[in-house]
Amino acid sequence: FDEKGILQGAYTVHNPDRLNRNVWAWRAMVDAVYSSIIAADLIVIETMQNDGRVITDALDVQIVCGMIIGRAPCEVITYTPRQWKGQTPKAVTIARIKRDLTPAELDRIDKKATHDAYDAIGIGRYHLNKND
């Protein structure tokens, strides 16, 4: 985000080497994200909420988030899903985000963007609105 709205919304391709969980696969994932945060003033990340479930993919995301935070060149703020969207279903969350974006912002979102990309946009918007 900048003063004009969303700069970019994109999807990072799933890394099949992740299944090996070797150090080079994890590094490749962090490097894929790091190049887009190097000039950031602030990073806002969704963290896992503890609701008793253990989801391997969610744990993987937490590991990558931890590595990104470790390399972050700026302040990092985290929110749980409960904090920023409550129990809202994915489809409703995406529809609300799209409804609230300008046509110019919508054009900056990759057409292949998944719910994860829209969650990232939603978390950023939540933080900006909370701190206005």
Predicted regions: what is each one?
Residues 1-132:
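Phosphate- and other anionic-substrate recognition elements at nucleic-acid/protein interfaces
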